[in-house]
Each structure stands twice: as structure tokens, then as C-alpha cells.
Curated annotation (Swiss-Prot):
Specifically methylates the N1 position of guanosine-37 in various cytoplasmic and mitochondrial tRNAs. Methylation is not dependent on the nature of the nucleoside 5' of the target nucleoside. This is the first step in the biosynthesis of wybutosine (yW), a modified base adjacent to the anticodon of tRNAs and required for accurate decoding. Monomer. It catalyses: guanosine(37) in tRNA + S-adenosyl-L-methionine = N(1)-methylguanosine(37) in tRNA + S-adenosyl-L-homocysteine + H(+). It holds the Pfam family TRM5-TYW2_MTfase. This is tRNA (guanine(37)-N(1))-methyltransferase. Its main location: mitochondrion.
Length: 500
């Protein structure tokens, strides 16, 4: 960008918007078009050389003058000379004249770049939801927030309200806490996304237009006749397009305002016949509605579609996976169709985020999922070294089997620990086996306290070894004289460890 065409340097640091301060005069090249020359033909020949700025007309028919950009045009030879000569335009038609620029001629990004601190990050992006612009300003920009809001209202079409996210999302209903920094406090919006219409109160629900592509990706995985359980449905960005595709959708959201908007949006898009809406806590929804409906679908041989479960609450969705194992306990049911779970989470760290996301899922499911995973996908970056990820797992609801495995883990642990301590009191030749068993114990995760339990095992093991009897004579003792380790005491010690 030519420095002469930028806002004046004197506006740097402005906190209260002064539109008059952006006025300036600059000299730029013009081409005077002779009366005998067709103005439109000349404009076509000069199309790539025109000076294009906000609210500035480079072609002035009444003056028969075309304003050119000063960067590509510094002299006559910079222009397409031969085509211009054919039109009767000669070198003496090129002149330099002054023009007046003002606040109206600058786009919002140029204005903010000129005003905000030069050596710090400026306004990188914002979201537009209907007539609302939603900002997430860094601390160093807070003194300029009123100015930023006014500039955006002036420059962004149809903007009537500008808000700034005031805190991280920590409330029960996961909606934004926001500050009105410019415009009117009107938060009812109507928007379109992926061919669907949504109405909601932006101040009372969660909506992120940056997830539009992700919503479409999930919809593209669905086919007519499929079944979708949408655990945190919000206002319906998964539910509505899935229902429009011919899927049956069981949708839930805890927020009463989201639930109301969900019902309205299903009606607006004429898909209510394919959707059941619930206003429940997600855990209760999993244990009751999802469980009962899924049992009925699995028992119905007529249902042959695929089953999907969307869990788009990245701050805590993985924690709710703990309720899936054992969900079908006490039921004689064949899992003839394995539900495909799409669970979202935040992964934070400087390295590859995929292993971090997988570890979170495994932590709450209680089993390794490496062999079950379909994919782990990057969704978007939410902060430095923090990404939103989607883990797609086709076997996360092998519920009965997973439940039995988890249920038996404490017994298996006790059995292995007993063997470790018994071997520790026998011959040195068996120490190798002891180490092998101890190594296996380290892989067992009991109540997500693996490291703590392992440390306690080692401490107890060391105490037992320290108290063992002196090494027996080389000649083996008769079987009747062999000492038997006090396994009852060891099992008692182990139980205490497990209860910690």
C-alpha cells in the first residue's frame, strides 16, 4: 500500500474516534480522456491501473478523467501505451493532481491498523452473527474498544450491535458473557448456515459461526435413515441439517433458551417430524433417553441405518464418556450396530495434539482406543498451543463388554499384586518373573490413579523385601517345611491402596 494513501500518522493512539482527523490531500496520476475517445473503452484498457478506495469513483465521466493508482503508474511508459494511442490518448494526457481523502475512503482494517499500538497485535478477527459483531479483544486493546466498535459499525454492512466477550465461558449453560461496546442492545438474530435458518437470542445461547464447516462435515457423514443422538444440540446446527437429510434425531440441551430455539428452528426448517427435543442434563439424557431409545432401535430388526452420537461440548464432553461403559448392564442385547461417536475436546500443548486428544478419551472411557479409532481431526485453533479436536470412535459404545472389563480390573489387580509379593519372598531366580509382573501392573489404570498406585506398590514391595528371611541353604527344603507368605495381610494392604 502506498504510504500516501494510508491514514495520517497523527491518528496513532487515538482512543476516542475523531473522523475529521483522517482527512488528507495527496497527489496521484490522472489520465485526461479526449472528447473524441470513448470513455468506456479507455476505462477497460486501464482497468488494472485504477485507484480503488472506499467511496471513491476513479472514473469521472463529467470531467472525462480517470484516476490512476500511484504505485503502478509513475510515468507514461508504465501504462499500456499502444492500446491507449489507438484510442487517441497521448502522453500529454497524463497529469498529476491532488485529491482529498477522508475517513470515508478507508476500510476498517486500515483505520484500526493506523490507530492501534504499532508494535502489538491488532484486531485479528471477529465474528458476525446477523447484525451483531462479536469481538474477543486482548487486554492491550481494551482502552480502544469503544473506538473499535464505532469503526466496525461504520464500516461493516448491516452491523447495529458490537459486543466483546468479557470472560471465558464458565457458566452452566455455556453461553458468552459479553459487554456491549457500541450500538443497540438487540440480541435476537436470524441467520442462515448451510442452507438452514436459525433464530435465537445470541446473549443467551452459544453460537460460533467459525464452526460452520465442521457442522457441514458431520452432516456429510450422515445418510437418509440414520439415527443421530445430539447430546449438546444448542440451537440445532447438527440437528436441523441432519433431520433435513432424512435422519431421525434425538436432540438434547440443558440450556432452556437453547432448547426453545432448537424447537423453533426445527419448526422453521420443517423437520419437526424427524426430531425429538429434550431439555435435560447430558448425563441424565445418556442414562435414560439415549439408553432406552438405543435399546429399542437395536431390538428393532427393521432399523438398518447407522447410529451417530455427537458430543460437541469440548470443555467437558470427554468427561461424560465415563457414563457409556456399563450403560446396558443387566440387558440381554446384541450391539448389532456400533454407534459412531464424534466427541470434541480441547488439546493443549506445544506438540502434536492428536495423542493428547486420544489420551483424554482413554482416560474417561477407561480403555485404550488405538485399535478402535476412525480418526482424530483438527477442528480449529482457539488459543496459542490450544486446539479444538474431534475424536471419531466407532466402538466407544461396546458398553456391556467395556463395563465388565472395568468391573474386573480391581480383582485382576489384586491377583497380580498377590503373585508379585509371593514371588518376592522366594528364590532369586524368580526375581525376573517378579519384574515382568510388576511391569504389567504399571499398565493397569485403576480409577485414573495409575501413577499413585504404582508408587504405593513399589513402597509396599520394598518393605516386604526388606523383611524377608535370610537366603535358604542351597539344598531345597522338603515341601512340608516351605514357608507360605502371609497373603491375607498383603491383600489387605492392597485393598487400602485401591481405596486411596
Amino acid at each position: 500500500m502506498c504510504a500516501d494513501l494510508l491514514p495520517p500518522a497523527t491518528v496513532r493512539g487515538m482512543e476516542q474516534l475523531d473522523r475529521d482527523a483522517f482527512a488528507k490531500t495527496v497527489r496521484v496520476p490522472h489520465l485526461i480522456i479526449p472528447e473524441a475517445t470513448n470513455l468506456n473503452s479507455a476505462a477497460r484498457a486501464l482497468k488494472q491501473y485504477l485507484l480503488k478506495m472506499e467511496h471513491y469513483k476513479p472514473i469521472r465521466s463529467e470531467e472525462r478523467k480517470i484516476t490512476l493508482h500511484p504505485i503502478p503508474v509513475k510515468q507514461w511508459e508504465d501504462l499500456p501505451v499502444e492500446p491507449l494511442k489507438e484510442l487517441g490518448i497521448e502522453k500529454d494526457c497524463l497529469v498529476w493532481e491532488e485529491i482529498k481523502l477522508s475517513y470515508e475512503n478507508y476500510k476498517y482494517d486500515l483505520i484500526l491498523k493506523a490507530v492501534l499500538p504499532e508494535n502489538q497485535e491488532g484486531l485479528s478477527a471477529f465474528s458476525k452473527i446477523g447484525h451483531i459483531i462479536h469481538l474477543n479483544l486482548k487486554n492491550h486493546l481494551m482502552p480502544y474498544r469503544r473506538l473499535i466498535g464505532e469503526v466496525l459499525m461504520d464500516k461493516v454492512a448491516d452491523c447495529r450491535t458490537v459486543v466483546n466477550k468479557s470472560n471465558s465461558i464458565q457458566n452452566t449453560y455455556r453461553n458468552f458473557e459479553m459487554e456491549l461496546i457500541c450500538g443497540v442492545p438487540e440480541y435476537e438474530v436470524s441467520i442462515k448456515e448451510n442452507g438452514c435458518t436459525y433464530k435465537f437470542n445470541f446473549s443467551r445461547v452459544y453460537w460460533n459461526p467459525r464452526l460452520s464447516t465442521e457442522h457441514q462435515k458431520i452432516t456429510d457423514m450422515l445418510e437418509e435413515g440414520d439415527l443421530l443422538y445430539d447430546l449438546y444440540a444448542g440451537v440445532g446446527p447438527f440437528t436441523v441439517p441432519a433431520a433435513k437429510r432424512g435422519c431421525t434425531v434425538i436432540a438434547n440441551d440443558l440450556n432452556p433458551d437453547s432448547y426453545s430455539a432448537l424447537v423453533i428452528n426445527c419448526g422453521l426448517n420443517k423437520v419437526m417430524r424427524n426430531v425429538k427435543c429434550y431439555n435435560m442434563d447430558a448425563v441424565d439424557f445418556i442414562k435414560v433417553e439415549l439408553r432406552n431409545d438405543l435399546l429399542a432401535k437395536l431390538a428393532d430388526d427393521k432399523f438398518q441405518g447407522n447410529i451417530h452420537i455427537t458430543m460437541n461440548l469440548p470443555a467437558m464432553a470427554v468427561e461424560h464418556l465415563v457414563h457409556f461403559p456399563g450403560l446396558f448392564s443387566g440387558e440381554s442385547i446384541e450391539l448389532r450396530i456400533k454407534p459412531l461417536v464424534h466427541v470434541y475436546c480441547f488439546a493443549q500443548g506445544a506438540d502434536d495434539k492428536k495423542p493428547i486428544a486420544q489420551q483424554k478419551v482413554e482416560q474417561w472411557l477407561g480403555v485404550e482406543v488405538t485399535d478402535m479409532l476412525k480418526e482424530i481431526t483438527f477442528v480449529r485453533n482457539v488459543a496459542p498451543n490450544k486446539d479444538m479436536m474431534r475424536v471419531r470412535n466407532p466402538s466407544a459404545l461396546g458398553m456391556a463388554k467395556k463395563a465388565n472389563k472395568l468391573k474386573d480390573q480391581p480383582k485382576q489387580l489384586a491377583k497380580k499384586a498377590k503373585n508379585v509379593f509371593a514371588v518376592s519372598q522366594t528364590k532369586k531366580g524368580n526375581l525376573k518373573k517378579t519384574k515382568e509382573v510388576a511391569a504389567k501392573l504399571k499398565k493397569i489404570n485403576v480409577q485414573d490413579k495409575r501413577e499413585k498406585v504404582d508408587a504405593n506398590f513399589k513402597t509396599l514391595h520394598a518393605q516386604i523385601v526388606a523383611k524377608k528371611t535370610p537366603k535358604p541353604a542351597p539344598r531345597p527344603l522338603p515341601a512340608k517345611n516351605k514357608t507360605t507368605p502371609d497373603t491375607n495381610k498383603m491383600e489387605t494392604d492392597l485393598t487400602k491402596l485401591e481405596m486411596k
